[in-house]
């Protein structure tokens, strides 16, 4: 089969589509012929050597995919050759085939494109996990979702909206702010020219929010804590703004705040299956009905993965960037 292989050129990663060894699959797994995958920040970091895959996981990039079932393991009864599916992956998505545990698969709606299917698993499950399972977001509460124009952001805004929460968000361009408002954000703040903590406190008459979902990290920590209500939660899912920061424990103790660090990729198979099932019960019907939807910015052929990575690295995308695999 073919897959994207990472090679170094003057310490810069070069992504090449070339022949690699075929993969095997276990009795509880399904072999899927991939039609589309997607670019995530984790892929950019892994390509540069900063985010190695968990032990035992394929070194091939790609944390999600859509495709066609090509073969099933002996223990698999609920999937058949030819089924259209999508799934969260620990790795291996930038390839022609991948092996997936059968309980991680979701059926791709007939009206959906391969690109739409590949735009869902990683970011929608990440947003669901951290807003509703870790963050315990409830109807009537207020949430600040940073990086609202990202894949996780565009998914999170919609799910929070549908759950009955008031949504605030940050983004770095007028286009992204407009899209966030269209998706349901009550207030979209340009972090490049506005103080988001001041804007949030003004918009909430000094009350703040119940939950902050933050992929930025260190540089936002103090402001995030400042705007949280009593018993508020800060869920940290990234370190784009740095790993370290001073913390005012007075805010944490005085308001009984919780700071939660959360990653999806490193969780056990059992945890991922549980998260997938809960997401399917709560939000899959809304996706099928078109009440919420994956936001896709651009689609690249897989042979242009290098250009797709640069596009995401430059923060040009609103929503997901997809890689499609041509079927010969």
Predicted regions, residues:
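Short, glycine/polar-rich helix-capping loops at beta-to-alpha or helix-loop-helix junctions
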Residues: 93-96, 171-179, 196, 244-249
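C-terminal capping/lid region of NAD(P)-dependent oxidoreductase domains
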Residues: 289-298, 306-328
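NAD(P)H dinucleotide-binding glycine-rich loop of Rossmann-like/cofactor-binding domains
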Residues: 45, 78, 84-147
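Short glycine-centered segments of the SAM/dcSAM-binding site in methyltransferase folds
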Residues: 84, 142, 166, 232-233, ...
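Glycine-rich beta-strand-centered segment in the early N-terminal region that forms part
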Residues: 22-38, 50-92
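Glycine-rich phosphate-binding loop and adjacent beta-alpha segment
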Residues: 219-291, 324-328
């Amino acid at each position: 089969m073919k897959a994207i292989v990472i090679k170094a050129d003057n310490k810069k990663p070069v992504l090449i589509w070339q022949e690699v060894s075929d993969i095997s699959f276990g009795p509880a797994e399904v072999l899927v012929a991939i039609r589309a995958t997607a670019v995530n920040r984790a892929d950019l970091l892994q390509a540069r050597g900063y985010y190695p895959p968990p032990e035992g996981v394929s070194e091939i990039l790609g944390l999600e995919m859509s495709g066609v079932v090509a073969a099933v393991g002996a223990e698999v009864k609920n999937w058949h050759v030819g089924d259209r599916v999508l799934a969260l992956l620990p790795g291996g998505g930038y390839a022609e085939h991948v092996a997936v545990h059968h309980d991680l698969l979701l059926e791709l709606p007939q009206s959906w494109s391969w690109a739409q299917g590949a735009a869902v698993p990683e970011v929608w499950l990440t947003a669901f996990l951290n807003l509703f399972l870790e963050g315990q977001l409830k109807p009537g509460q207020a949430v600040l979702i940073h990086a609202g124009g990202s894949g996780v952001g565009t998914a999170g805004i919609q799910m929070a909206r549908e759950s009955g929460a008031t949504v605030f968000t940050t983004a770095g361009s007028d286009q992204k702010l407009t899209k966030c408002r269209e998706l349901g954000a009550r207030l979209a703040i340009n972090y490049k020219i506005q103080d988001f903590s001041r804007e949030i406190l003004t918009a909430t008459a000094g009350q703040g929010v119940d939950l902050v979902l933050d992929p930025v990290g260190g540089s936002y920590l103090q402001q995030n804590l400042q705007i949280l209500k009593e018993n508020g939660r800060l869920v940290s899912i990234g370190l784009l703004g740095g790993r370290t920061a001073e913390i005012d424990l007075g805010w944490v103790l005085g308001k009984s705040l919780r700071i939660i660090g959360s990653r999806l990729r490193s969780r056990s198979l059992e945890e991922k299956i549980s998260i997938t099932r809960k997401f399917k019960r709560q939000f899959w019907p809304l996706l099928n009905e078109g009440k919420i939807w994956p936001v896709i910015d651009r689609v690249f052929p897989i042979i242009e993965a290098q250009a797709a990575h640069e596009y995401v690295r430059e923060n040009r995308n609103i929503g997901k960037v997809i890689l499609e695999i041509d079927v010969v």
